[in-house]
């Protein structure tokens, strides 16, 4: 109800805005289901963090490769280069994964993951965000 008020009643937030909520409890399956339904029905993008996960920056961890959200031009170029016709041809990343929440990727957006490689120094991998 609080989220509906911010988006609809008071019109403080628009569909282009991200609402980040920090809670003291763990995020449960019911909350994730509600956030998925909210995105599917109204395109309201809400990220809920457990405060314990904010004690360190996951993006600075040495095991987490660099993630970059592609803009629309890069997305078009990526799809042309790799002949991607359908989004189902791209591996997905859940919008509720810690890295996806940290970079704020929305469902339908593509992120480029730059991983270290023994043979090529770095390798690029791409993932599409799923709701």
Name every feature range the model reports, one short phrase each:
Residues 115-116:
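Short, surface-exposed secondary-structure boundary micro-motifs
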Residues 34-78:
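Extended boundary segments
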Residues 121-131:
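Short, compositionally biased
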Residues 85-97:
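Short, structured beta-strand/loop micro-motifs enriched in basic residues and often containing a Trp
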